[in-house]
């Protein structure tokens, strides 16, 4: 089954009900939300989410297990200085996700900043273990990054090494096509790209795909998303991910730019699903 959707707005007054309604209007069957502003740890109380309205009207069209939550960008579980704040926040975030019944929490691995990468790697593994020990049900997904600055997890070997070191069935990977392209993985050479995903064992842990085009050339380490078919990756390569059996049943989530201050996810989903 093809699962495709996008980031949708989780905002007052309708929160979860409104987000899933927007997804269905886009002809999606999966969705991704932030539980607050992406650049903030501010959160409203779960009783404001309009969970019962969602359950009454949309539960069957997009069930909770097909709702993906993204952690805010500003936390850094790989930093020995910031890890405690990040970990405490994520434990509370997972409690809110359990209230919804969602399955996955996507997390940027963080930056090693002034520390060595090895120190940051050990801290990240420790953070993930601590968060999982204090929570239940939700699966943490580390996201593949572009390698901008001191970002962690910009290559497949590193992210798989970290995931395997955590040693938990509740840890996995979210692959972002823009990020991995910018990190140097050539999606235009699709057979080789799939071979690399298998060789590094990343496929064993892949639970969600962020499907984005890139404004930047291969290996640029920029992390600038483009609309589908408007970037350097191109529609043909991104469409292959939709239909290739290797990625069957994995939710594909669009995080592409707005056009004229409006999302065009409905158009992009239709474009991707159109067989040529």
Swiss-Prot record:
Record keyword DNA repair present: yes
GO molecular function: deoxyribonuclease IV (phage-T4-induced) activity; DNA binding; DNA-(apurinic or apyrimidinic site) endonuclease activity; phosphoric diester hydrolase activity; zinc ion binding
Positions of Zn(2+) 1 binding: 70, 108, 143
Positions contributing to Zn(2+) 3 binding: 179, 223, 225
Cofactor binding mode and count: Binds 3 Zn(2+) ions.
Superkingdom per UniProt: Bacteria
Keyword terms: DNA damage, DNA repair, Endonuclease, Hydrolase, Metal-binding, Nuclease, Zinc
Enzyme class label: hydrolase
Catalytic activity, EC: 3.1.21.2
Cross-referenced SMART domains: AP2Ec
Binding site for Zn(2+) 2: 143, 176, 210, 255
Pfam family, one: AP_endonuc_2
GO biological process: base-excision repair
InterPro entries per record: AP_endonuc_2, AP_endonuc_F2_Zn_BS, Xyl_isomerase-like_sf, Xyl_isomerase-like_TIM-brl
The reaction(s) this protein catalyses: Endonucleolytic cleavage to 5'-phosphooligonucleotide end-products
Cofactor: Zn(2+)
Family: Belongs to the AP endonuclease 2 family.
Described purpose of this protein according to its UniProt entry: Endonuclease IV plays a role in DNA repair. It cleaves phosphodiester bonds at apurinic or apyrimidinic (AP) sites, generating a 3'-hydroxyl group and a 5'-terminal sugar phosphate.
Protein name listed in UniProt: Probable endonuclease 4
Species: Mesomycoplasma hyopneumoniae (strain J / ATCC 25934 / NCTC 10110) (Mycoplasma hyopneumoniae)
Gene encoding the protein: nfo
